Regions:
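Hydrophobic beta-strand segment of the Class I
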Residues: 6-7
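C-terminal substrate-recognition regions of SAM-dependent nucleic acid methyltransferases
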Residues: 72-142
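Local beta-strand N-terminus motif with an aromatic residue
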Residues: 2-3, 34
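Conserved Class I SAM-dependent methyltransferase catalytic core
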Residues: 14-74, 78-88
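Non-catalytic DNA-recognition/assembly elements of restriction-modification systems
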Residues: 10-12
Length: 142
C-alpha cells in the first residue's frame, strides 16, 4: 500500500523494553509514501550514533530534506527532550542537502546524516556565540 502523504507522531517505545520504536515506524513508512512525509520525533536521534541508528540514518538520507527543532513544551506535561519536525520528500535529488534548523539561529546543511551532527561541546559553543553581542551577528540564520 502506498500513500501520497504521511503525517505522523509515532510511538517511541512499546512498553515492553523496545527502544527506538519511532525509528522502526519511520523506517517502514519511508517505503510507503509517494510525495511527502512529515514526522514528529525527538531531535536527539540526530546526535546518536551506533550501528542500528546509523542504519536508520542511511535509509532516511534518501528522502529527508529538512528538520526543524522545537521545544518539547508544545506537548504539555512531557519531560522529553526537544522534538524535531522531520520532512521527507520523494522528489529529493542525490545532491540535495538536508537542512537542520536548530533552536536559536544555527542551521546545518548536510549531504548525509552520517556526516555527523555536532556534539554537545559544539552545541554549547554555538549557543554561547548566538547570545554574545560580539559574535551573534556572524551566525548564519535562515
Amino acid at each position: 500500500m502506498k500513500f501520497d502523504y504521511i503525517i505522523g507522531n509515532p510511538p517511541y517505545a512499546d512498553g515492553k523494553g523496545v527502544k527506538n520504536l519511532h525509528l522502526e515506524c519511520v523506517n517502514y513508512c519511508v517505503g510507503m509514501f509517494n510525495n511527502k512525509m512529515v514526522i514528529v520525533m525527538p531531535i536527539t536521534f540526530l546526535k546518536q550514533s551506533n550501528t542500528k541508528i546509523n542504519k536508520f540514518k542511511k535509509t532516511f538520507d534518501s528522502s529527508l530534506v529538512e528538520v526543524t527543532e522545537y521545544k518539547s513544551t508544545i506537548f504539555e506535561g512531557t519531560t522529553m527532550p526537544n522534538i524535531g519536525v522531520y520532512v521527507f520528500d520523494k522528489s529529493k535529488k542525490a545532491d540535495d542537502k538536508i537542512n537542520i534548523h536548530y533552536l536559536g539561529k544555527h542551521t546545518l546543511s548536510l549531504s548525509s546524516l552520517l556526516d555527523g551532527i555536532y556534539d554537545k561541546t559544539t552545541n554549547d559553543i554555538l549557543s554561547y556565540l548566538e547570545t554574545s553581542k560580539d559574535y551573534s551577528k556572524h551566525i548564519y540564520s535562515s
